[in-house]
């Protein structure tokens, strides 16, 4: 399992749009918003490839400007 903390930088994304995103082999938890910066997520995936796919899906959400990985832990 690989886990990551992610910052979603956005202009006007509803947190519910991020919460309801369906990821194939990964699970995510919206931890909350950071004033002026975006939304922090925790993502757990089966493999590095699955994590990459999940990050790609987040980047496709309308209004998302950047998807930044803050930390990665491989368990």
Question: Model-predicted segments: where are they?
Answer:
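A compositional/biophysical signature of low hydrophobicity enriched in polar/charged and small residues
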Residues: 1-75
């Amino acid at each position: 399992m690989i886990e990551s903390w992610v910052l979603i930088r956005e202009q006007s994304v509803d947190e519910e749009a991020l919460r309801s995103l369906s990821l194939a082999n990964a699970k995510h938890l919206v931890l909350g918003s950071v004033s002026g910066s975006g939304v922090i997520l925790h993502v757990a995936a089966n493999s590095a490839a699955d994590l990459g796919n999940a990050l790609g899906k987040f980047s496709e959400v309308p209004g998302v400007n950047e998807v930044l990985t803050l930390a990665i832990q491989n368990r």
